[in-house]
Amino acid sequence: MPRVKGGVTSHKRHKKILKLAKGYRGSKSKLYRVANEQVMKSGQYAYIHRRLKKRDFRKLWIARINAAARNNGTTYSRMVHGLKVAGVDINRKLLAELAISDPQGFTQLAELAKRSVQ
């Protein structure tokens, strides 16, 4: 049985990796070995940052809620506690969106939270 050289398979594999490395700087988009290393590292970065994205958005929402709450004479922690005591079940994403898009509605929630804590 003759030996199969595998040129077609190797070429396809190399093309696939170089296509994934398109847009990378320098040899990372030109040379197969370097490109392969960078594609693998990029996959690791993507995996890690898909998890970090959730934390980052939560931080952003909390910062926005805190800023809006301070404009209404309270703090983030007091407001969230007040809403929990009042039985208002609203998540931070919606609360942050409300603070931006409907300041009057947010003010009403802030007043409700202040009343329920006292």
Curated annotation (Swiss-Prot):
Record keywords: Ribonucleoprotein, Ribosomal protein, RNA-binding, rRNA-binding
Gene Ontology MF terms in the entry: rRNA binding; structural constituent of ribosome
Record-linked Pfam families: Ribosomal_L20
GO BP, sorted A to Z: ribosomal large subunit assembly; translation
Coiled-coil ranges from the UniProt annotation: none
Protein origin, superkingdom: Bacteria
GO cellular component: ribonucleoprotein complex; ribosome
Function: Binds directly to 23S ribosomal RNA and is necessary for the in vitro assembly process of the 50S ribosomal subunit. It is not involved in the protein synthesizing functions of that subunit.
Family in the record: Belongs to the bacterial ribosomal protein bL20 family.
Record-given protein name: Large ribosomal subunit protein bL20
Organism: Syntrophomonas wolfei subsp. wolfei (strain DSM 2245B / Goettingen)
Organism phylogeny: Bacteria, Bacillati, Bacillota, Clostridia, Eubacteriales
